[in-house]
A protein has these predicted regions:
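Signature of Asx- and small-polar-rich beta-strand/turn repeats characteristic
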Residues: 1-202
Length: 202
């Protein structure tokens, strides 16, 4: 089952799209293909690309949609337009474990409510090179609107098959509105205080 395989579900006469967020492979048992515990994410899978331009000192790698689910974000860097080698970058969870070879990215919210991806400086995290292509893959959602969806229909195909039986283990949940500015103002000083240290000042 390919990443981005789509399903639909309806709530109050409104149809929502759900997609898979990873490739899944199984072997048939007695001629039957059965995927278990498949996670579906409400929304549309989107891919956005930036080409690194070292002459643009103000270049930023912004996720264009304010409704992007950053928990689904996958960041890869292609060497160049002629070298299609891909390197996966992971979200930095702290600074102490990073060095100049760490393929890590950082994430911050802009004043427009969109998120910006940025990278290391060859001291803390590996620095990007001119001509690198930054590939941002993520799901754009309808936030909390699809919570409660319980019946799903395959709207694409799986390995060429369209006659698929689906059993729902749990209803859709977890969709939420973005964090409010008031909440950000309250939490940001607390996060800044820790700064990845074991001891904070008081």
């Amino acid at each position: 089952m390919n990443k981005g395989t789509s399903f639909t579900s309806s709530i109050d006469n409104t149809t929502y799209q759900f997609v898979t967020n990873q490739d899944l492979t199984i072997s048939p048992q007695d001629g039957v293909y059965k995927f278990s515990n498949v996670n579906l994410y409400e929304g549309t899978l989107v891919t956005f690309r930036y080409t690194v331009d070292s002459t643009d000192v103000d270049q930023k790698f912004v996720i264009p949609s304010v409704n992007a689910d950053t928990s689904t974000l996958k960041v890869t860097v292609q060497n160049s337009s002629t070298d299609t080698t891909l390197n996966t970058y992971t979200l930095a969870s702290g600074l102490r474990s990073l060095d100049n070879t760490s393929k890590a990215y950082f994430l911050q919210e802009t004043d427009t409510g969109k998120f910006q991806v940025y990278f290391g400086d060859d001291v803390i995290g590996k620095k990007l090179s001119d001509g690198n292509i930054v590939i941002l893959e993520y799901i754009v959602t309808n936030k909390a609107d699809s919570n409660g969806a319980s019946s799903f229909t395959l709207s694409s195909s799986v390995g060429g098959f369209t006659d698929v039986s689906i059993t729902t283990n749990s209803n859709a949940q977890g969709g939420a509105e973005p964090e409010t500015k008031e909440s950000i103002r309250f939490n940001a000083p607390l996060q800044y205080t820790s700064q990845d240290r074991a001891v904070t000042t008081t």
